[in-house]
């Protein structure tokens, strides 16, 4: 099942079934649709019961969708988690996950703009598979980790390299957390629909050209290992997001470097999950 968030006619966030080009609002399928943020309380059987009976229940996909989770408690990101990306950067293969975070103000949805800040001239792209947590998790083993995953979405870990690496002491948080620097979407694909998240093709297109192309088989720390590691430290809650890392081909590693410019269009495509599209504009 693929689920998205959108604004209804009254300007209220709602959930809908998603397919490219169309959505089916859940409020058309049940008298008790989940309130915003409450989709994670629906078990698999209840979700499976939400099936349209008439093609007329589908409506045209809005030009902009909301972030797949409105106000996650945590937006956790993993750095240098693809072997081929670590090699490209000249970094040592990490012995444990490199963890950082983003603020909620980074979150935008499919079709929204990425605002390029005036204080950075080195804004880079990073296509990522994002895990959406569905059940509270603390001290969870890798063997049980996937029981706590609601689903997956496409993410874009936009990064200001001149802040991330060029400021005194390095400023990973600031370089990663400018407003609009975490597009997600267009939808959450529930975990039951993704048979093998450890072998999904991940691509980034910049203005139609493929600039990143790898698979999650290159992950140094797979999703169960990440959840096991993180839950030794923090409690993961429904709606928390985990950006799992990016493949090689980032702009900073190119010769000459390639950084995002106003008018650029970024497409994150993940096999079996979807395609997230955002255009860059200058921040005002």
Task: Describe every region a protein language model picked out.
Residues 1-97, 267:
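N-terminal non-catalytic cap/leader segment that marks the start of a structured domain
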Residues 4, 65-67, 88-90, 114-123, ...:
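A generic local secondary-structure boundary/capping motif
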Residues 5, 58-60, 85, 91, ...:
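Catalytic-pocket segment enriched in acidic/His residues
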Residues 68, 122-124, 235, 259-260:
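Residue-level "contact hotspot" at macromolecular interaction interfaces
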Residues 93-110, 125, 261-272:
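Structural signature of FAD isoalloxazine-binding scaffolds in flavoprotein oxidoreductases
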Residues 130-136, 140-155, 161:
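RNA pseudouridine synthases
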């Amino acid at each position: 099942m693929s689920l998205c968030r959108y604004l209804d006619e009254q300007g209220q966030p709602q959930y809908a079934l998603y397919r490219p080009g169309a959505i089916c609002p859940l409020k058309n399928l049940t008298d008790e649709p989940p309130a915003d943020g409450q989709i994670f309380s629906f078990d698999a059987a209840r979700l499976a019961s939400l099936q349209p009976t008439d093609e007329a229940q589908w409506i045209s996909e809005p030009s902009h969708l909301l972030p797949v989770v409105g106000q996650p408690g945590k937006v956790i990101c993993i750095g240098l988690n693809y072997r081929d990306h670590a090699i490209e950067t000249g970094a040592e293969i990490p012995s444990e996950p490199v963890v950082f975070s983003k603020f909620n103000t980074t979150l935008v949805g499919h079709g929204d703009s990425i605002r390029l800040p005036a204080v950075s001239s080195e804004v880079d792209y990073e296509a990522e598979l994002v895990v959406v947590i569905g059940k509270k998790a603390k001290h969870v083993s890798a063997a049980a980790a996937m029981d706590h995953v609601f689903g997956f979405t496409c993410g874009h870990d936009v990064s200001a390299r001149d802040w991330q690496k060029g400021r005194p002491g390095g400023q990973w948080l600031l370089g990663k957390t400018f407003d609009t620097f975490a597009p997600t979407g267009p939808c959450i694909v529930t975990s039951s629909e993704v048979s093998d998240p450890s072998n999904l093709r991940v691509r980034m297109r910049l203005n139609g050209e493929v600039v990143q192309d790898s698979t999650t088989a290159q992950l140094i720390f797979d999703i169960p290992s990440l959840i096991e590691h993180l839950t030794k430290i923090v409690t993961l809650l429904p709606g928390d997001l985990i950006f799992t890392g990016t493949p090689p081909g980032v702009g900073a590693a190119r010769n000459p470097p390639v950084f995002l410019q106003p008018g650029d269009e970024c497409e994150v495509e993940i096999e079996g999950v979807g395609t997230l599209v955002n255009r860059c504009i200058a921040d005002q």
